[in-house]
């Protein structure tokens, strides 16, 4: 496999994409963030797009939250499963993230959850999402970074830190494949990748009140009891940032939280 060859059957390689319980839990978390950012009770009347939808569980949750929902992916086996189960309420299409089959300014909400590291051209994907998102619309981002201690796809410590050849060798020695495909950006690189958006960081709000954001499955109870300064000190060790990016200048419109979202600069 070449370094950035497209992954055309990702759900066949990563069983976690078919774990319905965990995927729906992730969906509830991201919907809670979106609702707070937009200051809405549900997504009724909004048009939503899940980029990299695979088997469709997150897209289905968006639809059940009231949004007219679309899902795109190049993972045709995953899309076949999605259409079979959820095709009556979600429009699923085979499409690349850098060539979305939607008009300019046509989406209110876009989801890009743990996807950028797995696509051939992240910059092109992010640019085309910006094109289809309406002014004032939001892009939900679940983004890992290069310095995460535990790499989330293969659950191997420090894997994303390594040069390609060493990462491939590590993966083989661990019995988890032959080629490490994912490519993570540093935190500074992530800020550059999403520089066209007004980005707000919800990572600390989720850590401070995981129940409100349906994150209590992954956030230990003791973490939520830490003061804000201590939570902020933990941020470099957090493997996934929870960001909400507005097209144009925007700010969260939901009620006050125990810890407020911070603008990413």
What residue ranges belong to the model's regions?
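Conserved class I S-adenosyl-L-methionine
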Residues: 138-167
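A short SAM/SAH-binding and catalytic strip from SAM-dependent methyltransferases
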Residues: 109-120
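A short glycine-rich, Lys/Arg-flanked "PGG" loop and its adjoining helix->strand segment in the class I
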Residues: 123-138
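Short conserved AdoMet
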Residues: 64, 87, 120, 134, ...
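Conserved N-terminal segment of class I S-adenosyl-L-methionine
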Residues: 1-103, 109-111, 238-241, 251-265
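A C-terminal cap/extension of S-adenosyl-L-methionine-dependent methyltransferases
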Residues: 187-265
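Short N-terminal helix/helix-N-cap motif within the alpha/beta-hydrolase-1
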Residues: 60, 77, 119-124, 151
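Acceptor-substrate binding/catalytic loop of class I
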Residues: 173-188
